[in-house]
A protein has these predicted regions:
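Fungal secretory targeting signals
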Residues: 1-26
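Sequence-level preference for short, compositionally simple segments enriched
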Residues: 19-336
Length: 336
């Protein structure tokens, strides 16, 4: 973690608006009407080439459909004036388990100037929905290496997978939702400074490590809106990984006003009894944190929690965290 945080055809204004909501458990094996098509028999061979063909000036909704396959590239979605939906081919939209589209690369901060530029997907446009895509950073242990850099408001990721080791997801700005998705990592693998992020029905897979941290929220003042809520999710060792009991913490404070809640979440014994950890011994950063839990279950939810954490008397709601208008941009069919 460094202090600096330094995806068919372009739709015309008269084109049919891209669909933005699909019923869970429906298949999606061909491009929705009006979408740019990547891979298979589509016009575009890379995801980035389809992204580059999007209109930067149109306000009509746009979409991209990606055929099954592995795409070895880094993708940057610049700010658009329209809503954008990116679909991955799948026979089951309700889950990440049947995903057939993977975007993967291995940049890290060893060869990029900041966290954002290491990400497999650099998502800088607001009003973005991403469905059933696996985002992977293969760098592994040793450096910051992101699968996703989410840098804009009203972004939703549904039935996706995010895999990395350190700093897997940068939830940096705006309001964001991650639902029915899989997130994997070891060190600070959900982190950022200003975003309000709601994680719903997600599986968090932790990798083999002597010690690990799921979140590292960098909220730096009482006026900073940042808030991470992990709701109705599961925490366990990632498939194929052996993780010692108590090796992982729910989070540590990147900044003093760090704010994270885990609620109604199943935790295996990989979670330490203390739950939460100081940033480091000489610089704890716990004086203004909000670290809380409600109705969690499993062996990892038991024990004496850190003195700077608390228990809530009721669960937080999406409207409380994301705002009363959240259903205007969130695909609520994916929420618990």
């Amino acid at each position: 973690m460094l202090p600096s945080i330094a995806f068919v055809l372009t739709l015309a204004a008269s084109a049919v608006a891209a669909p933005t909501t699909l019923a869970p458990r429906a298949g999606r094996t061909s491009p929705p009407s009006g979408c740019l098509a990547v891979g298979g028999s589509g016009k575009y061979k890379t995801v980035q080439s389809a992204v580059d063909a999007l209109s930067a000036s149109s306000t009509a909704a746009q979409c991209i459909f990606i055929a099954k396959g592995t795409y070895k590239e880094q993708v940057y979605i610049k700010p658009l004036k329209s809503a954008l939906t990116v679909y991955g081919e799948t026979t089951d939209t309700s889950s990440y388990t049947g995903n057939t589209v993977t975007i993967t690369q291995g940049k890290s901060q060893d060869d990029a100037p900041n966290n954002d530029e290491t990400a497999t997907l650099r998502a800088w446009t607001p009003n973005l929905k991403v469905y059933n895509i696996n985002l992977v950073n293969t760098r592994g242990q040793g450096s910051q290496a992101l699968a996703l850099s989410a840098y804009a408001d009203k972004q939703g990721y549904y039935g996706c997978q995010f895999k990395g080791y350190q700093d897997t997801i940068l939830a940096q700005q705006g309001s964001q939702v991650y639902a029915k998705s899989y997130i994997e990592g070891a060190t600070d693998f959900i982190f950022g400074q200003k975003a309000i992020a709601w994680f719903d029905g997600c599986s968090l897979g932790v990798l083999t490590a002597s010690v690990g941290y799921i979140t590292a929220n960098g909220r730096d003042s009482d006026s900073n809106p940042s808030y991470y809520v992990i709701n109705n999710s599961k925490i366990a060792a990632a498939p194929g990984n052996t993780v010692s009991a108590g090796a992982y913490y729910l989070g540590r404070p990147w900044r003093n006003f760090s704010r994270v809640v885990f609620q109604k979440t199943s935790m295996t014994n990989v979670i330490n009894a203390a739950g939460w950890k100081v940033w480091n011994t000489d610089d704890p950063r716990t004086d203004k944190v909000t670290y809380a839990e409600y109705a969690n279950t499993g062996d990892g939810s038991k024990g004496t929690r850190a003195s700077f954490s608390k228990k809530l008397s009721a669960a937080l709601s999406p409207s409380t965290v994301l705002g009363s208008d959240y259903k205007s941009w969130v695909d609520a069919a994916y929420l618990s």
